[in-house]
Amino acid sequence: MRKIIVGTRKSNLALTQTEWVIDQLKKAGVKNEFEIKKIVTKGDQILDVTLSKVGGKGLFVKEIEKAMFDKEIDLAVHSMKDMPAVIPEGLTISSIPEREDHRDAYLAKDNILLQDLPEGAIVGTSSLRRGAQILAERPDLTIKWIRGNIETRIRKLQEEDYDAIILAVSGLKRVGLSEELITEYLEPEVCVPAVGQGALAIESREDDEELTNIVKKIHDAYTAKTVSAERTFLHLLEGGCQVPIGGYAYLDGDEVVLTALVGDPDGTTILKETVRGTEPTEVGKEAAELLISQGAKEIVDRVKEEMDQ
């Protein structure tokens, strides 16, 4: 029986997610032996600038995908929100397990609510999407970029001049940090999450049928359907996770309901639409067309241009 080598980033969160996937596969009856191989990605190496300035798609996946092409690893576990809208030829997202919490978490010193933060208070985030939506809600706040893993960011909130930070709820839960740290859960009505937030992507070589059949055991149809709508929208706007784009879908009966967002980083323009329909890719396409007709493409292109300077 073959040994399966799983590639992942070396952060605590990435390792925890990978161990969770292996655990789920074993619970599903997979008897193979697994080995985890830690891989350093470009996004992990560059910590002194904002992610959006680093630019490029696949900041956290390219090196891992190369290891897969080179057959150093058999499969990879990624955060879905790190996945570019287009997967390299020869590779495929072979399984999408059940999604963890999709929401953003707002953590504040002294648990001060977002609406009660004083004027000029500093909110830490490395995401233009989060920054744009916070500024749309509270233009009097100051957004300051913050990098590092979850534990580092929480420490920075406690020790540095941040009044609050925004993190993904799923990340906090996965690394086992107490949800008591969370001051407020930001529902999609307040802050539309990143496309695929809370979901994982298991990526493998397209021609490896044996492995595809193994990882399909933990594939979740509900998550796959909703993520498909979100990622279709992302693909049509040609946005990576470093652009102020958000998308969250859920199922209502047999309909997919997608809320899609594109915003100016300063929060002055927020384009947001909710679309529903039975076919996930059609829903994603309709949302993209609606926002493009309102000027979303111009915002995305302008942000990309500013990043390249």
UniProtKB/Swiss-Prot annotation:
Q: Which reaction does it catalyse?
A: 4 porphobilinogen + H2O = hydroxymethylbilane + 4 NH4(+)
Gene Ontology MF term list: hydroxymethylbilane synthase activity
What GO cellular component entries does it have?
cytoplasm
GO biological process terms held by the UniProt record: protoporphyrinogen IX biosynthetic process
Q: Which UniProt keywords apply?
A: Porphyrin biosynthesis, Transferase
UniProt pathway? Porphyrin-containing compound metabolism; protoporphyrin-IX biosynthesis; coproporphyrinogen-III from 5-aminolevulinate: step 2/4
Q: What would be one Pfam family of this protein?
A: Porphobil_deamC
Cross-referenced InterPro entries: HemC, Porphobilin_deaminase_cofac_BS, Porphobilin_deaminase_N, Porphobilinogen_deaminase_C, Porphobilinogen_deaminase_C_sf
Q: Which residues carry this modification: S-(dipyrrolylmethanemethyl)cysteine?
A: 241
Q: Which HAMAP family match?
A: Porphobil_deam
Entry similarity comment: Belongs to the HMBS family.
Instruction: Indicate what this protein is called per its UniProt record.
Output: Porphobilinogen deaminase
Gene coding for it? hemC
